[in-house]
C-alpha cells in the first residue's frame, strides 16, 4: 500500500499597535485581522482518498489598555490596569481583563512580585499530541467555540549573583482555566475512519 497525507494549515495576522506614556500612566490600542486555515486534511493513494472541507476563518480583534503605576514606599510599587477587547468571527465577543501587580525590592539583588488578573485569548492552538509530527495548528473562536480565559495568581522571585552577572528566577502560580479545547484524534482516525475537525475537539476546564 502507498498513500500520501497532507495537513495544510496557516495563520496570517495584519495589525497595528500604538502606545502612549504620560507620567505614571500608560495606555494603548491595537487592532489585528486574523486569517486562518485550520487543519485541512488531504489523503491520496490506494489506501484511501479523502479531502476535508475545512473552511478558512477571518476574524477581527481590537483592544485598548490603561495602566497606572503608584509607589507605595521606597521598596514597594503597585501597578494597576485593565484591558478591554472586542472580537468578531461569525459572532461578537467582548471582554474586560483587569490586572494587579506588586513589586517589592528585598535588596539591591533580590526582588519579589505578585500578579493577579484575568487573561483572555481568542485563538486556540492544538494538534495531534501523540503523533510526534509538526501537526500543531491554530483556529479561531467563533459561534461554536467560545474564547478561552483564565483567572491567575502568580508569585515570582528574582535574585542576582556575582555582581548581577547571574540571575535566578523562581515562580509559583495557579490558574483557573475556562473554555479549554484539545484535539483527541490521531493519525489513524484520518486513515481508517471518518475524520471530523469539530468532532475531534474536547471541551473542558482546568
Predicted regions located by residue number:
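Face-selective signature of the C-terminal outer-membrane beta-barrel domain
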Residues: 1-92, 105, 169
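Outer membrane beta-barrel strand-and-loop segments of large Gram-negative receptors
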Residues: 5-15, 53-65, 163-206
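Membrane-spanning beta-strands of outer-membrane beta-barrel proteins
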Residues: 7-9, 59-61, 93-95, 138, ...
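Membrane-embedded beta-strands of outer-membrane beta-barrel proteins
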Residues: 10-14, 64-66, 98-100, 143, ...
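Residue-level signature of outer-membrane beta-barrel architecture
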Residues: 16-20, 68-70, 94, 102-105, ...
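Short coil turns and loop connectors of transmembrane beta-barrels in diderm outer membranes
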Residues: 21-22, 72-78, 108-109, 151, ...
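Membrane-embedded beta-strand positions of outer-membrane beta-barrel proteins
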Residues: 27-29, 80-82, 100, 114-116, ...
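Surface-exposed extracellular loop regions of Gram-negative outer-membrane beta-barrel proteins
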Residues: 37-44, 90, 108-153, 172-199
Amino acid at each position: 500500500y502507498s498513500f500520501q497525507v497532507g495537513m495544510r494549515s496557516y495563520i496570517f495576522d495584519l495589525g497595528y499597535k500604538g502606545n502612549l506614556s504620560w507620567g505614571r500612566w500608560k495606555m494603548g490600542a491595537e487592532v489585528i485581522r486574523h486569517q486562518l486555515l485550520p487543519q485541512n486534511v488531504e489523503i491520496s493513494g490506494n489506501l484511501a482518498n479523502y479531502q476535508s472541507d475545512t473552511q478558512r476563518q477571518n476574524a477581527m480583534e481590537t483592544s485598548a489598555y490603561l495602566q497606572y503605576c503608584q509607589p507605595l514606599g521606597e521598596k514597594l510599587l503597585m501597578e494597576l490596569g485593565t484591558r478591554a477587547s472586542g472580537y468578531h468571527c461569525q459572532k461578537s465577543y467582548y471582554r474586560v481583563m483587569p490586572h494587579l501587580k506588586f513589586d517589592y525590592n528585598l535588596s539591591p539583588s533580590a526582588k519579589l512580585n505578585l500578579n493577579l488578573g484575568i487573561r483572555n485569548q481568542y485563538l486556540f492552538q492544538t494538534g495531534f499530541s501523540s503523533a510526534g509530527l509538526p501537526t500543531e495548528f491554530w483556529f479561531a473562536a467563533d459561534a461554536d467555540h467560545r474564547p478561552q480565559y483564565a483567572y491567575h495568581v502568580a508569585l515570582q522571585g528574582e535574585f542576582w549573583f556575582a555582581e548581577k552577572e547571574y540571575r535566578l528566577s523562581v515562580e509559583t502560580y495557579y490558574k483557573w482555566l475556562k473554555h479549554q479545547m484539545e484535539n483527541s484524534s490521531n493519525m489513524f482516525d484520518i486513515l481508517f475512519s471518518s475524520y471530523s475537525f469539530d468532532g475531534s475537539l474536547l471541551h473542558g476546564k482546568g
